[in-house]
Design a protein with these regions (language model features):
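Short acidic loop-to-helix transition motifs that present clustered carboxylates
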Residues: 113-117
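A charged helix-plus-loop insertion that forms the helical arch/lid used to bind
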Residues: 79-91
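Histidine-centered metal-chelating micro-motifs
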Residues: 142
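ATP-binding/phosphotransfer module of carbohydrate and carboxylate kinases, centering on a glycine-rich
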Residues: 1-66, 74-78, 96-104, 118-133, ...
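Glycine-rich nucleotide/cofactor/substrate-binding loop typically near the N-terminus or early
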Residues: 70
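General beta-strand structural signal in soluble alpha/beta enzymes
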Residues: 106-111
Length: 258
């Protein structure tokens, strides 16, 4: 891993955030910049905002790759889905779009995958050498799987069918808010979700991210699982940090899964 700060950018449905990351420390090297996501979040419009963020940090970063997260399945630089962003992203050559717009190397990754990498490299699962499964509970459910520190990308475990339903329509944090559930009422939905995921993968550790992770003490002790489960440590910094780490790792280890 290089010593110069690396730029990580996190594209979300409402905001696009970027920060320089110190990969030796596993944290931001300078304050984060946030720009609202364009109301029409097409690839061209989003790339323009990303270019603004890059310009802001250009004189403080090296000439290495930029890591960018996006709420989509990403295979070989192509976005295969689109969650909370314009549907024109589906099957778009997104990594090339960003690289062409910025005039530099870009590594594009799924947002939950980036967060999971950050938690294993620097956060709640730091240096864990087993099977770590991270879920982010938000508008939907994102997921990341890492085995011995290596990412297995695009797991999309929010879309498991459980009891006839797409899992995230029953257990995402947005459902708790929509239905006005207390944590005591919500925990049963989480129990069902995690016990199914546990039976499929038998991970060594669950890490839970998303806004509800700050209230982990209100629901985690009530979950009856065989797998240890812990809240994420990096919170809303994880995506940016993970993107920066993956950008450098992709250059150093091009054989990793894409």
């Amino acid at each position: 891993m290089q010593n110069q700060p690396v730029l990580g950018i996190d594209i979300g449905g409402s905001g696009i955030k970027g920060a320089l990351v110190d990969l030796a420390a596993g944290d931001f090297a300078a304050p984060r910049l946030r720009i609202p996501t364009p109301s029409k979040s097409t690839p061209a419009n989003v790339a323009d905002v990303v270019a603004e963020i890059v310009a802001e940090f250009a004189d403080k970063m090296g000439d290495g790759p930029i890591g960018i997260t996006i709420p989509a399945v990403v295979t070989h630089g192509i976005t295969r889905s689109a969650a909370n962003i314009d549907k024109s992203w589906i099957d778009a050559p997104a990594e090339k779009i960003f690289s062409d717009r910025l005039g530099r190397s870009v590594v594009l990754v799924n947002d939950a995958d980036a967060a999971g990498v950050a938690e294993v490299k620097f956060g709640a699962a730091r240096d864990h050498q087993g099977l770590v499964l991270m879920t982010t509970l938000g508008t939907g459910i994102g997921s990341a799987i890492l085995y011995r520190g290596v990412l297995i990308p695009n797991s999309e475990l929010g879309h498991l069918e459980i009891d006839g339903h797409d899992a995230e329509t029953q257990a995402a944090a947005s459902i708790k808010t929509l239905l006005g559930l207390s944590y005591s009422e919500y925990v049963g939905r989480l129990q069902r979700y995690y016990e199914v995921v546990e039976a499929l993968f038998w991970p060594d550790l669950f890490v839970v991210g998303g806004g509800v992770s700050k209230d982990a003490d209100k629901f985690m002790p009530k979950l009856k699982l065989k797998t240890p489960i812990v809240p994420a440590a990096l919170r809303n910094r994880a995506g940016i940090i993970g993107a920066a780490w993956l950008a450098v790792d992709k250059v150093e280890h091009p054989e990793r899964p894409a």
